[in-house]
Amino acid sequence: MKSSTIPPMYAAIDLGSNSFHMLVVRHINGSVQTMAKIKRKVRLAAGLNENNTLSHEAMQRGWDCLSLFAERLQDIPVENIRIVGTATLRVASNVDIFLEKANQILGHNINVIEGEEEARMIYQGVAHTSGGNGRRLVVDIGGASTELIIGEGFEAQALTSLKMGCVTWLEGYFKDRALTQKNFDSAIAGAKETLAPILQQYTDLGWQTCVGASGTVQALQEIMLAQGMDEVITLAKLKRLQKQAMQYEHLEELDIDGLTLERALVFPSGLSILIAIFELLNIDSMTLAGGALREGLCYGMIDELQHDEVCQRTIKSTQQRYQLDVEYAQQVTDLSIQLVQQCGNDWLTEPQALPLLTAATQLHEIGMCIDYKKGGEHSAYLINALDLPGFTRAQKHLLGELLRRYREYFSAMPTQHAVSDISAQRMLRILRLAIILTHRRDVNLAPAVTLSEKNDVLSLSIDGTWLAANPLTRSELEIEADKQTNIGWDLVIDARD
C-alpha cells in the first residue's frame, strides 16, 4: 500500500495537574477514529509547595510518564502532534527546569497554554464530540483549575479558567482526609467564593444545556449508573453521593459502589466543586461530554472538520464505514418525517426525538454487515459498541433498542432515559411503518399515504387499488397492524376507494 493512502495519524498530549493523558487518532472517512488512549496518574499539583515550587519528586513522576508517551510519538508526523501543559505548569515557579528535560524526553516542545486558551480548546473538543442544539454551558474540573465556557455551535461566547481543582481543593479543604460536614461545607463555600466574580456574566448569557467534560464528571456518572440511576447528573443526585461519602470517616475508608480506587482520593473535592457550581449557577441537569481538551487539540489540526454538524458527520462516516445504502436510508428518513408531521408537530414531545428517529432511519440496516439473520440484534449491538460522537450513552441505548425492533423482533420499548416512554413508543411505530412502506427501495414505487392519530390510535390511509396491486405490502401492513394492536398500540389500515 502506498503511504499516501494510509489515513493520517494525530496525537494530543495534555499534561494535566492530576493526570497526564495521550490521545492518538486517525482521520478516516470524514471522521476521527480513536486509536489509543493512554493515561497515567501523576498528581503534579500535589507537588507544589506554598511558594509554587514544584518538587523534584513530582517532576520525576511527570518525566517517567513522558518517557512512556515518547515511544508512541515516534510513529506520528511532527506536524500532527500537539502537546500542552495546563494549570500546574502555568503557576510553577521552576517550570523551566521541568520543561527542559520534558522536551528532551519527548523530542517535541511543550506549549504551556493560558487558562483562556485551555477553555477555548476544551470547548472545541466538546463541540466536535457532543450533540445538542442551542447555547451550552461547559464545565471542566481539572486537578488545579476549573474551566467554564458558554458557547453555541463551534463558537465560544464566554471563557473562564478558575484556580480551583480536585487536587488543590483536596489539599486545601480535605488535608486531614476527614469526610465531615465541616470539610464539605468549607470546600463548597470556597468554590462558590471563587465562582462569584463570573456569576453575573454567565447568568446574563444563559444556556439551554449543560455538559461536564472532566474525569470528575465521568466518575460521578459511572457511580450513578453503577447504583441504578440514569446518566443525567442533578443536584439531588450529587447531594445523595455526598451523604454516601459522609458515611465514612476518612478518605482511605471510602467505598462507594461504582467509585474506582483511582478516583477515590479526589472524589470528595471534585464533588464539592460541582455541588457549588450547580447551586450557584442554578443548573438543572448535566450530561457527560464526548470530549474535551485533547479532542479539541486533535480536531484543531484537521481543517476539513472545523464546521461540520457533529451528529451528521458521525452518521455519514458510519454509513461509509459499513457500506450502507444511503439513498434507501434517506427514503426511509423522508417518509418517517412525513408521517410524524402528519400526526402533529408536538406528537414527539422532546426536541431531540425527531433527530434521534432520523439517526435510527439512517443507520437501521447496519447490522446486515454482519448477517441478515438477526439483523436487528446485530444493529443494536453495533450501535451500542461503536464510538458515535454527538450521541450520549442514553441516546445510543435508545437507538439500539429501536434498531433491535426494526424488523422481525417486536415488543414494547424497555426503560430508557433519552426521551419519554411515549415518544420512544411512537418513534418505534413510525420506524417500522416507514420501513414496510419503502421495502421496494424505490421512491417512485412507494404509495401515497396519510397517517392520522387520535389518543395514540394510528390510522394509515392508503389507496386500495395500490394495495390490491401490491399484495405483499398489504400483507405486511396487516401483520404489523395485528402486532401493534396486540400490545395495546392500536393501528388501523384504511384502504381508500
From Swiss-Prot:
Domain of life: Bacteria
InterPro entries linked to this entry: ATPase_NBD, GppA/Ppx_hydrolase, Guo-5TP_3DP_PyrP, Ppx_GppA_C, Ppx_GppA_N, PyroPPase_GppA_Ppx
EC annotation from Swiss-Prot or TrEMBL: 3.6.1.40
Broad EC category: hydrolase
Pathway: Purine metabolism; ppGpp biosynthesis; ppGpp from GTP: step 2/2
Keywords: Hydrolase
Record Pfam families: Ppx-GppA (PF02541), Ppx-GppA_III (PF21447)
Example GO molecular function: guanosine-5'-triphosphate,3'-diphosphate diphosphatase activity
Gene3D superfamilies the record matches: 3.30.420.40, Exopolyphosphatase. Domain 2, Hypothetical protein af1432
Signal peptide: none
The keyword Hydrolase is annotated on this UniProt entry: yes
Job of this protein: Catalyzes the conversion of pppGpp to ppGpp. Guanosine pentaphosphate (pppGpp) is a cytoplasmic signaling molecule which together with ppGpp controls the 'stringent response', an adaptive process that allows bacteria to respond to amino acid starvation, resulting in the coordinated regulation of numerous cellular activities.
HAMAP family listed in its UniProt record: GppA (MF_01550)
Similarity annotation: Belongs to the GppA/Ppx family. GppA subfamily.
Protein name: Guanosine-5'-triphosphate,3'-diphosphate pyrophosphatase
Organism for this UniProt entry: Aliivibrio fischeri (strain MJ11) (Vibrio fischeri)
Gene designation per UniProt: gppA
